Amino acid sequence: QTIVVDDITKPVPVMASLPTITRECAVTATDIPVPTATDNCVGVITATTTDALTYSEQGSYTINWMYNDGNGNLTTQQQTIIVDDIKKPVPVVASLPTITKECGVTATDVPVPTATDNCLGIITATTTDALVYTQQGTYTINWTYNDGNGNTTTQQQTIVVDDVTKPVPVVASLPTITRECAVSATDIPVPTATDNCVGVITA
């Protein structure tokens, strides 16, 4: 009498279709429940894979799971992993303050703003605009926060250079010049004043 034990039945995944796992910053092994299958001989089989279970770069990936009953029967399943950051950086200061100086604005007068990002944490703004302004007027700095994952936030900041301080005469009250016959230009010293921006001004 011949007795044959021949398992020809493949494992059957518990879940017919594995769910897509999506995260914004990264996917770690703890985010991926290891799937299982039922087998007519072994019972419950835990899947194995040679693919990575940690993904930190933005993109779409595929994990190839395998259920092996040890009797020559294999079943495979694929699972999609997506790392997709869709959140823009959030400026720490919702509205940047206007910076006003009388004579000029230098880079040290302009604190570089920051934003918080769900993946990177703190992001420092960048700009292609000037940070030094010496001429009277109103200017706009365009700041950009870039998280490196395709998400950017912009902010504008106003810079004002406006001299509102009048020159101050060096001599508060100019002396009367008296001559008996005539007064010439050499008898009249040209008065001066000090200015907060220019320095010494000749009248």
Name each region found by the language model.
Residues 1-203:
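Proline-threonine-serine-rich low-complexity tracts
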